[in-house]
């Protein structure tokens, strides 16, 4: 069986936004966030693919989740760093954060928003799991708990142990990167949730509709890379 690539954003969304895979999504979020108490429930706020996603190569195929305590978590898979990536991530966080406040509400009603980016590339950062907050320059006091952006660079997964990351996050990174399909069998033997993730990916890979969606997205990504290469060659990027 040819498995769909979980690094492809449409496959990532189909896998983790599916109602019958809430346990996988909860496990993934727990591995990244390491909350002080268990995540009791997750509600996917955007389970459907955006309109015109196939024709618009710039559309984001993220998974927006609301936790039991009202915290919103946005999870995104990126196969390569975009230009102005930091500004892009911050802008997207700001839009989500502002969207939690209704007209006339007090600022105290703003809900925390966490953005999680799984990136299949290395940036200038040196860590496998980078966590960005807003802190005072001298005493490093935290300005607000509300701003939190996690970036997990999948190629740096071998650094996970040295960074004292959880075994669960290391396993999820290996699952998402999936350089060798045989790695799934190894992961499945290490953890029951990984065995369930393996089964879910195999089932998704058998669906003709998922195969078609993945092919459309691959073609769009290929066309986008060609456009960027042409821009660079002509000095526009």
Question: Where does each model-flagged region fall?
Answer:
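Elongated, amphipathic alpha-helical interaction scaffolds
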Residues: 1-237
């Amino acid at each position: 069986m040819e498995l769909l690539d979980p690094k492809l954003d449409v496959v990532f969304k189909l896998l983790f936004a599916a109602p019958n895979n809430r346990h996988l999504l909860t496990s993934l979020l727990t591995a990244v966030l390491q909350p002080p108490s268990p995540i009791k429930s997750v509600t996917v706020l955007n389970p459907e693919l955006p309109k015109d996603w196939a024709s618009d190569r710039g559309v984001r195929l993220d998974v927006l989740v609301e936790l039991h305590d009202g915290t919103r978590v946005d999870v995104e898979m990126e196969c390569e760093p975009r230009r102005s990536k930091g500004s892009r991530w911050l802008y997207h966080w700001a839009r989500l954060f502002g969207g939690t406040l209704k007209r006339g509400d007090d600022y105290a009603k703003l809900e925390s928003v966490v953005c999680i980016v799984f990136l299949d590339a290395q940036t200038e950062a040196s860590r496998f799991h980078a966590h960005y907050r807003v802190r005072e320059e001298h005493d490093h006091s935290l300005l607000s708990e509300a701003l939190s952006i996690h970036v997990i660079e999948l190629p740096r997964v071998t650094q996970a142990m040295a960074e004292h990351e959880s075994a669960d996050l290391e396993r999820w990174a290996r699952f998402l990167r999936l350089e060798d399909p045989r790695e799934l069998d190894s992961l499945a033997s290490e953890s029951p949730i990984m065995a369930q993730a393996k089964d879910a990916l195999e089932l998704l890979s058998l669906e003709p509709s998922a195969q078609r969606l993945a092919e459309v997205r691959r073609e769009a990504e290929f066309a986008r890379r060609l456009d960027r290469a042409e821009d660079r060659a002509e000095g526009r990027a």
